[in-house]
């Protein structure tokens, strides 16, 4: 049984793992660079509520800090973590929940509009080349795809969720084998849910485009 679990990052996965740890009555510390959990996805107001949920559940929440190093024993087991504020924590399980980086390195030299944020494509999942011209026979789907969304001022957005990958692949496959009149757009309404600390958090739409938080 771990003395203490350290979770690095407090996005959805990190927060859900922290919730499970508390359900199992495991001591858990969450280290987060930002001001609050979930703040990147849901904003500061919801982030403050998420922080309160964690603290009330007994999570040792540390915000505004990073993990600078891990220390182990002679057998290679982690025993301590050093935080950027100088704190040293006794831990024996560390979970890195730092998000994902899109794998576009293999596209180097392909002359596509690809980079750190993914591969740019149109609503029909067709990739753009480096000059911003849409291609006719290269299609993109999944987390790596970034397309303009009509509901959000045509801002290029990627949706990192399994259902977007499934539905995007369906649209891409349809458009690969269809003539122009048979092609259709992939314009999903962003949505997800997350169960943590006895609360089901559900989001529909994009928080930054909301008019009011109540």
Predicted features by range, described:
Residues 3, 26, 59, 79, ...:
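A structural micro-motif
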Residues 66, 86-87, 199:
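Well-ordered beta-strand scaffold positions
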Residues 4-8, 12-69, 161, 185-193:
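Rossmann-like dinucleotide-binding cores of NAD(P)H-dependent redox enzymes
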Residues 144-214:
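Mid-to-C-terminal Rossmann-like scaffold of FAD/NAD(P)H-dependent oxidoreductases
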Residues 14, 37, 70, 104, ...:
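Flexible, glycine-rich phosphate/dinucleotide-binding loops
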Residues 1, 74-77, 82, 88-164, ...:
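FAD-site-proximal beta/loop scaffold in flavoenzymes
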């Amino acid at each position: 049984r771990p003395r203490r679990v350290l979770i690095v990052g407090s996005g959805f996965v990190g927060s859900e793992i922290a919730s499970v740890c508390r359900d199992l009555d495991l001591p858990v510390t969450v280290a987060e660079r930002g001001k609050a959990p979930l703040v990147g996805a849901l904003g500061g107001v919801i982030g403050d509520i998420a922080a309160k949920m964690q603290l009330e559940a007994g999570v040792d929440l540390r915000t505004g800090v990073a993990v600078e190093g891990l220390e182990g024993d002679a057998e290679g087991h982690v025993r301590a973590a050093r935080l950027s504020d100088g704190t040293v924590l006794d831990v024996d399980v560390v979970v890195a929940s730092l998000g994902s980086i899109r794998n576009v390195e293999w596209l180097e030299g392909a002359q596509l509009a690809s980079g750190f944020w993914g591969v740019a494509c149109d609503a029909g999942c067709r990739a753009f080349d480096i000059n911003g011209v849409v291609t006719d026979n290269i299609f993109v789907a999944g987390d790596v795809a970034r397309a303009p969304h009509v509901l959000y001022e045509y801002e290029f957005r990627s949706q990192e969720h399994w259902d977007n990958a499934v539905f995007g692949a369906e649209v891409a496959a349809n458009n690969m084998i269809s003539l122009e009149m048979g092609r259709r757009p992939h314009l999903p309404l962003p949505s997800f849910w997350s169960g943590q600390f006895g609360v089901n958090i559900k989001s529909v739409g994009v928080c930054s485009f909301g008019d009011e938080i109540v």
